[in-house]
Amino acid sequence: EYIDEDSWVDFVIVQEISKNIDGNLKTSCWMYKERDENKLYMTALWDFDLAYGIVNWSNADEERNDASDCPGSGTYEDFMIINSSCPWIKKLYQQDEFRELLTERYTCYRTTVIAELQALIAEQAAYLAKAEDANYKLWKKNFSLGVANLQTWLNGRLEWLDEVWLIEN
């Protein structure tokens, strides 16, 4: 009765797909409440520099982002924000109604929005490939390898989440 379940479910799905360390409600999360309502809404997803398997603790604020709270943050398996030391998400996930809504929504998104995300990555990588030489000269990073790593990591993460959340028809 105190949260907008739809916005919170979407928030958890996005943060868990990306395994975003900053999505733990301690640093980079925005919420709002309508003046005439008692519900808290999640909004404005942002700050994904420590997500999608890219975990560089030299750039992270270990105290605020809980480096010790996120073991295995670069792997495909296990939950990130559900298992963080911030109890709100874990408490929500322990409620059957919330978890059922989450798995239903994930199942729906898996064949639509998530499939579109994977196609968008490939499409944008092809478009940006024209600038790959300039990118390498500036950053000394291999763009194609970075895209391949992202796709491999995302596919592995989705396979793991499918085992946990995907509803078989």
Predicted features by range, described:
Residues E1-L25, C29-N169:
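Middle-to-C-terminal accessory/interaction subdomains
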